[in-house]
């Protein structure tokens, strides 16, 4: 029952999300001002990663069966007709692209703090900071390569997947969630850390940014300060969306995976909640960045045109 309902949901969700993501990319490319030159790149990468994440999750339609030992990863989407290793590659792509969206938002918040605090910071230091914050993504890639070697390297293992999936009609087994390996432990730490630690860290940095903005001299106008606050508030909201959407189901996942409880609702709904923030992110970006918001207000006819008033001055 869950599979039939969610197969329709995934298609509908993708149709809803894709146009907003493409529209967001268009607005960023077309209407970014000079002062958004750096942030434009991160906003674009974020939306592109979200498109990849949603597309792969909709093609996979995953279910992690927690009551089996080891925990099996089932695929109900169109990708199930491919080989197990191909499907697992899509699974890895969905995982990495999702993590990228979380870390890109946090990196943007941190670089905004650096920009507010030290205007003349050297470019090489920014590069070092970005690479350090992206290190968990590289670790995830290495860990997944290690797991793929374990799952698919022996020919007997691939034959086992082929034989197992040959007798299944509605889904395919594409891999396992195993414990006892360093790579599995690192993946768990990175995934849970990105969901539970990045949002509070982003909120803490936001407070420091607002403090820096408020303490700046009068050289920055009220409008400029408002634009900065609006931008950072939008980024903070983006970083908190995964926590709000995923926190309860992740807690449930942790319990059922340890107790080996069969809970179909949790198994099916987890991937849905993972991609749910992508529905709201484009709207947050377009509203929180002032040039984009002004352009959309212009398109909607909400910007009032002030008539020119000619005043005659009299010299005394």
Swiss-Prot record:
Membrane topology, from the record: Multi-pass membrane protein
Record keywords, A-Z: Membrane, Transmembrane, Transmembrane helix
A GO cellular component entry from the record: membrane
Subcellular location: Membrane
Database matches in Pfam families: 7TM_GPCR_Srd (PF10317)
Disulphide connectivity of cysteines: none
Membrane-spanning residues: 8-28, 42-62, 89-109, 127-147, 185-205, 236-256, 269-289
Annotated coiled-coil segments of the chain: none
Plastid as UniProt keyword: no
Entry-linked PANTHER family: SERPENTINE RECEPTOR CLASS DELTA-45-RELATED, SERPENTINE RECEPTOR, CLASS D DELTA
Family listed: Belongs to the nematode receptor-like protein srd family.
Listed name of the protein: Serpentine receptor class delta-48
Organism: Caenorhabditis elegans
